Amino acid sequence: MTAKSVVVLDYGSGNLRSAQRALQRVGAEVEVTADTDAAMTADGLVVPGVGAFAACMAGLRKISGERIIAERVAAGRPVLGVCVGMQILFACGVEFGVQTPGCGHWPGAVIRLEAPVIPHMGWNVVDSAAGSALFKGLDVDARFYFVHSYAAQRWEGSPDALLTWATYRAPFLAAVEDGALAATQFHPEKSGDAGAAVLSNWVDGL
């Protein structure tokens, strides 16, 4: 069987090489690049992201990343957002009182977590959606690695989307599966066997 081709979008943010290695370990042929043609034609596109929402959006715009994501989604070609790469898929992010427009694939805002200790950093369980493809075969007590201060804490998008939640004092979205567009707030590339299983499930679905 021919390996599935995956591009990890290089727009100046994210754990690019660790994502590349994690995807290679589950059998994908992976390229880290900002090249539009490569990003458009790959079987799957991974949009990583760490740091500030506004900085990630600025980097994405420099390489026409918004258009790449939008055209892939419109064509039904799979996209996976990770951490801030998930957050920027929403309508906006609010950091330090400043609202930054996101890619707008999902309505709603990404806002700061309300908890005694910020960021939420470490391992946590999730409540995966019934019928989830990403979490297929995983135990209910599987743990995933998070490091973030902001999250989407409500869902205003399609009622058909599969929503996976986690709790850090209050619930927040840990993953979304919405047609060709999927995303995780946790880092699958840092989440050991459980994260590898999520990536493997995603690659298998390409």
UniProtKB/Swiss-Prot annotation:
HAMAP family: HisH. Induction: Down-regulated in response to the thiol oxidant diamide. Its EC number is 4.3.2.10, 3.5.1.2. Coiled coil: none annotated. It is found in: Cytoplasm. NCBIfam families: IMP_synth_hisH. Residues 5-206 form the Glutamine amidotransferase type-1 domain. GO terms for molecular function: glutaminase activity; imidazoleglycerol-phosphate synthase activity; lyase activity. Heterodimer of HisH and HisF. This is Imidazole glycerol phosphate synthase subunit HisH. SUPFAM superfamilies: Class I glutamine amidotransferase-like (SSF52317). GO terms for biological process: L-histidine biosynthetic process. The keyword Zinc does not apply. The gene is hisH. The active site is at residues 83, 187, 189. Pfam families: GATase. Gene3D superfamilies: 3.40.50.880. It catalyses: 5-[(5-phospho-1-deoxy-D-ribulos-1-ylimino)methylamino]-1-(5-phospho-beta-D-ribosyl)imidazole-4-carboxamide + L-glutamine = D-erythro-1-(imidazol-4-yl)glycerol 3-phosphate + 5-amino-1-(5-phospho-beta-D-ribosyl)imidazole-4-carboxamide + L-glutamate + H(+); L-glutamine + H2O = L-glutamate + NH4(+). Pathway: Amino-acid biosynthesis; L-histidine biosynthesis; L-histidine from 5-phospho-alpha-D-ribose 1-diphosphate: step 5/9. GO terms for cellular component: cytoplasm. It comes from the Bacteria. IGPS catalyzes the conversion of PRFAR and glutamine to IGP, AICAR and glutamate. The HisH subunit catalyzes the hydrolysis of glutamine to glutamate and ammonia as part of the synthesis of IGP and AICAR. The resulting ammonia molecule is channeled to the active site of HisF. Keywords: Amino-acid biosynthesis, Cytoplasm, Glutamine amidotransferase, Histidine biosynthesis, Hydrolase, Lyase.
